[in-house]
């Protein structure tokens, strides 16, 4: 068979053939390419040549992009739908047996039986018993051909219940032994836990990498280095910054947080839920105290002709930054935003204005703007620098790091992960770096224990 590779960049050609081979041999293929290397274009090429009905399940924010990419390849999808709408079970595409959605066996999927189902950002299916996880398991049980896309499919074996089943790492029944063999153990309250920095866990991730890429040949991955001059330079710096007079306030918040957590451990039977609430409350307060530093950095970058992109965790922080910038007309007319609750039209308008350099500052909520959004320099006039407030989620962080560093970017990128100096965040900085390295152990099979800052 003769294949038309004219719409693909050179590194994508061998990559798509590996995906095609795995779909025919394994029934599943996994694209674990780095962000910005063209996973959607590669998937569309595969769909074009696979010659089956095409279903795309993806985050809502990237639905327009999927329609555009499929159209470029002459494909009209059976449906392009977001996870949340689909898994509610009230569309023609999915229903629940007897109105229940307790297990994957309750999921009645109504896609064409010979459909190729593309799951974009498949890390959204990593939950142990989430709806998305059950949906992916149901797809595999119903023998659909699956093309899974994510730069960050999972950080550890506990997140591989559905992913591992789809890629035959386990058969669900063997999931318990799969995670225990990978270094997991039963925690204080009965759930599974794992030390992702342990030698056993790191070796397990390397073994999983070997199975996916070499033994099963179910996965393929493109890196930015493969694209030579197509990608600009990219420097990621995780560092601590002086928060000035707010440093003492930040330390005080963390002291209160630690005391509340200690009291909770002694008194609460529902430790996990309250633990998360206490942590979130403290992080929200601390992030607001970083706003003056972030605003100063934004202004400095803007004045240098750079277009800054700022990723934060809370809408309160987005509002505070925009309010501070709004006090000066130089900056107030140039601010774009990506936040939860924003209409699709307003969000896309701001992204378009930023990409066209009509707006020069982008403030994004990490949860809303970390996946599927392109914010790279298309024109060569205003290099992109990002400022990231750490989320302590390696997946969110790595996805955000791929927003300004993408194929065909015209200028080098600098990305700074912002930690507060002289606080316990100095330890958190090292933990985040460790998580980012552990993601690479899934993608690159890196056995080293080193912390790497690019």
PLM feature segments, named:
Residues 76-83, 172-173, 309, 326-347, ...:
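Conserved RecA-like helicase motor-core motifs
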Residues 1-30:
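Conserved pre-motif I regulatory segment
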Residues 120-121:
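Walker B catalytic acidic pair
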Residues 76-96, 355-372:
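Conserved two-lobed SF2 helicase motor
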Residues 224-327:
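Conserved helicase/translocase motor-coupling segment
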Residues 318, 336-428, 435:
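Conserved RecA-like P-loop NTPase helicase motor core
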Residues 35, 40-72, 154-159, 313-316:
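Conserved Walker A/P-loop ATP-binding site and its immediately adjacent core
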Residues 116, 133-227, 409:
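Conserved P-loop NTPase motor "coupling/switch" region that bridges the ATPase
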């Amino acid at each position: 068979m003769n294949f038309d590779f004219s719409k693909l960049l050179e590194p994508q050609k061998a990559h798509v053939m590996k995906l095609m081979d795995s779909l025919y041999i394994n029934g599943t293929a996994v694209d674990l390419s780095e962000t910005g290397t063209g996973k959607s274009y590669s998937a569309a090429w595969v769909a074009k040549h696979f010659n089956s009905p095409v279903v795309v399940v993806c985050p809502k924010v990237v639905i327009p992009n999927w329609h555009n990419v499929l159209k470029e390849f002459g494909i009209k999808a059976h449906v392009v739908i977001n996870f949340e709408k689909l898994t509610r079970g009230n569309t023609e595409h999915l229903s629940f047996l007897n109105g229940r959605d307790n297990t994957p066996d309750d999921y009645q999927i109504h896609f064409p039986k010979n459909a190729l189902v593309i799951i974009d950002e498949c890390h959204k299916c990593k939950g142990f018993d989430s709806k998305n996880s059950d949906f992916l398991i149901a797809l595999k049980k119903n023998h659909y051909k699956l093309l899974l896309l994510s730069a960050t499919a999972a950080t550890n074996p506990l997140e591989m219940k559905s992913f591992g089943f789809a890629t035959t790492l386990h058969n669900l029944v063997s999931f318990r032994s799969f995670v225990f063999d990978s270094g997991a153990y039963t925690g204080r309250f009965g759930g599974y836990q794992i030390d992702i920095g342990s030698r056993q866990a790191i070796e397990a991730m390397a073994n999983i990498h070997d199975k996916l890429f070499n033994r099963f040949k179910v996965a393929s991955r493109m890196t930015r280095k493969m694209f030579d001059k197509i990608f600009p330079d990219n420097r990621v710096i995780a560092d601590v910054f002086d928060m000035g007079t707010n440093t003492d306030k930040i330390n005080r918040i963390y002291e209160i947080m630690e005391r509340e957590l200690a009291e909770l451990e002694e008194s609460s039977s529902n430790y996990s839920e309250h633990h998360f609430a206490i942590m979130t409350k403290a992080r929200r307060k601390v992030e607001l105290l970083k706003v003056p530093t972030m605003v100063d950095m934004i202004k400095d970058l803007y004045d240098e002709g750079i277009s800054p992109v700022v990723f934060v965790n809370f809408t309160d922080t987005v509002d505070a930054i925009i309010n501070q910038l709004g006090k000066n007309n130089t900056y107030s007319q140039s601010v774009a935003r990506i936040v939860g609750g924003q209409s699709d039209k307003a969000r896309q308008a701001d992204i378009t204005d930023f990409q066209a350099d009509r707006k020069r500052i982008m403030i994004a909520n990490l949860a809303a703007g970390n996946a599927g959004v392109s914010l790279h320099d298309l024109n060569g006039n205003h290099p992109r620098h990002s400022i990231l407030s750490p989320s302590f989620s390696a997946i969110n962080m790595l996805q955000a790091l791929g927003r300004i560093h993408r194929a065909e970017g015209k200028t080098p990128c600098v990305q700074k992960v912002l930690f507060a100096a002289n606080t316990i965040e100095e330890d958190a900085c090292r933990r985040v770096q460790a998580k980012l390295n552990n993601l690479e152990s899934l993608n690159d099979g890196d056995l080293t224990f080193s912390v790497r800052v690019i």
